[in-house]
Regions:
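A short acidic, Gly/Pro-enriched loop at the edge of an enzyme's catalytic core
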Residues: 72-84
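C-terminal lobe and adjacent flexible extensions of AdoMet/dcAdoMet transferase-like proteins
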Residues: 182-238
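Class I SAM-dependent methyltransferase SAM/SAH-binding core
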Residues: 24, 28-74
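Conserved catalytic loop of SAM-dependent methyltransferase domains
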Residues: 159-184, 193-194
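A short SAM/SAH-binding and catalytic strip from SAM-dependent methyltransferases
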Residues: 82-97
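Short alpha-helix
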Residues: 139-162
């Protein structure tokens, strides 16, 4: 059995290095997204929604969850979520395509989905192929960018922005990570498709709909939920 869980790995020097890079990519999109409801999925100490201007923000399956749910069935009404962040979620799923379909269901028309995932065509992907390590992330599926791009139009989603990051080799020595950090600029210029992770901004497209003035749903959650950080509860209409 794996000795290191995803939660533990993302607290390691390499995991923190990766999350810091991803935060820098994700934050500008978060700050530029408006609406009523924003969701972050995943077990991370980092809050990707901390700079969001959206009032109602929730985390799923995190160390301090606002909502407890299975990733396969999101507890939200159809077309009710404006922004959903799913960092390194698809690669942990048995059926990642089904999760994309579920995300499409809950997103508003023109709603945004942010995905990050490990790139198999990278130094990280090479280590995964050559490693017998049973710990995260080397025991997960590295889904290729081409496969993601193949799935998106099938489920009604469209990629509007994409970028690679983390060109350093996957080492855990913090001192070495600081020394070779310059590889990020070099990689972005000379081998941009070989980063350790990809960052994608995706939108839900609904043909024939005018998304300028969508009909916002006032209520979101199917059952009342208590949050230690909030005193408000929300309930879906029956």
């Amino acid at each position: 059995m794996p000795k290191i869980s995803p939660q533990e790995w993302f607290k390691s020097p390499l995991g923190q290095y990766l999350l810091t890079l991803e935060y820098d990519y994700i934050n500008p999109v978060v700050m530029d997204t408006f609406g009523f409801y924003a969701i972050q999925m995943g077990n991370f100490d980092i809050n990707f929604l901390d700079q969001s201007r959206i009032q109602n923000k929730f985390s799923l399956n995190s160390n301090h969850p606002d909502l407890m749910t299975s990733n396969e069935a999101l507890p939200f009404d159809e077309a009710s979520v404006d922004l959903l962040i799913a960092p390194h979620i698809l690669e942990q799923m048995i059926e990642p395509y089904e999760l994309l379909k579920e995300i499409h269901r809950v997103l508003m028309p023109e709603g945004r989905l942010i995905i990050t995932g490990f790139n198999p065509v990278s130094l990280w992907g090479i280590k995964r192929l050559l490693s017998f390590d049973i710990d995260y992330p080397w025991n997960t599926k590295f889904i290729s960018l081409s496969k993601i791009k193949e799935w998106l139009p099938i489920v009604g989603l469209e990629m509007v922005e994409g970028k690679m990051g983390c060109y350093v080799p996957p080492i855990q020595q913090e001192s070495w990570l600081r020394k070779i950090h310059t590889m990020e600029k070099l990689g972005d210029r000379w081998w941009p498709m070989l980063g350790g992770f990809y960052f994608l901004v995706i939108q839900k497209r609904v043909h024939g709909m005018n998304a300028i003035q969508p009909l916002w749903k006032k209520k979101l959650i199917k059952t009342p939920v208590y949050s230690a950080q909030r005193s408000r509860t929300f309930r879906l209409k029956p």
